[in-house]
Regions:
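Surface-exposed alpha-helical segments enriched in charged/polar residues
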Residues: 55-56, 121
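Conserved GNAT-fold acetyl-CoA-binding loop/helix
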Residues: 34-55
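Acyl-donor (CoA/ACP) binding surface of acyl/acetyltransferases
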Residues: 1-33, 66-181
Length: 181
């Protein structure tokens, strides 16, 4: 448990800044293939890279932010993130690509949908983002359903956009506008 503030919802979940006590959790994301699962884990990486990023800006930077998804008892269940993406003309508005990763023991219980709702609510309340996007592996049916449940609309398929587990993978892009579909 850290001493940083939380953004809570009625779902028993909270979003909060990454704290020093979460560094072991972040290490697991780099060193345990099961932690991120088959759709996200890119292979072994430099475990120290996540610690360096935390030391640099606490994972709350101007172009990307990562928050801990925390259960009511303080257990970190995963991470929620966003990063700025540029679309259209310069100064045409802010667009964030969001992401969510839950540890295997917390998947399949509706936490992903609840965490997506919290992240959407947070971004539309505290940023000027007009558009949110999410990309997911085309085979990640659970994530696709979660995105659709919270109002994202499928916009298309990015063919063979990511190389993972020995093959090129398609991704599906979803979007949600501040004022609805």
């Amino acid at each position: 448990m850290t001493d940083v503030g939380q953004y809570a919802a009625d779902s028993g979940l909270a979003l909060r800044a990454i704290g020093a006590g979460d560094l072991g959790f972040l290490d697991r994301l780099c060193s345990d293939p099961e932690a991120l699962g088959p759709f996200e884990w890119p292979g072994f990486g430099d475990v120290r890279a996540r610690r360096r990023r935390w030391e640099q800006d606490g994972y709350a930077g101007p172009d990307s932010t990562v928050l801990a998804v925390v259960l009511a008892d303080g257990t970190v269940a995963g991470i929620a993130s966003w990063r700025t993406v540029r679309r259209g003309q310069p100064d045409s508005g802010i667009c964030y690509e969001i992401g969510l990763a839950l540890l295997p023991e917390h998947r399949g219980h509706g936490l992903g949908t609840a965490a997506h709702r919290m992240l959407i609510d947070y971004l539309f309340k505290f940023t000027v983002a007009h558009r949110l996007e999410a990309l997911t592996d085309a085979a990640n049916v659970a994530e696709r359903k979660a995105l659709e449940r919270v109002g994202f609309e499928r916009e298309g398929v990015l063919r063979e956009v990511a190389f993972r587990h020995g093959s090129w993978r398609d991704a599906v892009i979803y979007a949600l506008l501040r004022d609805g579909p």
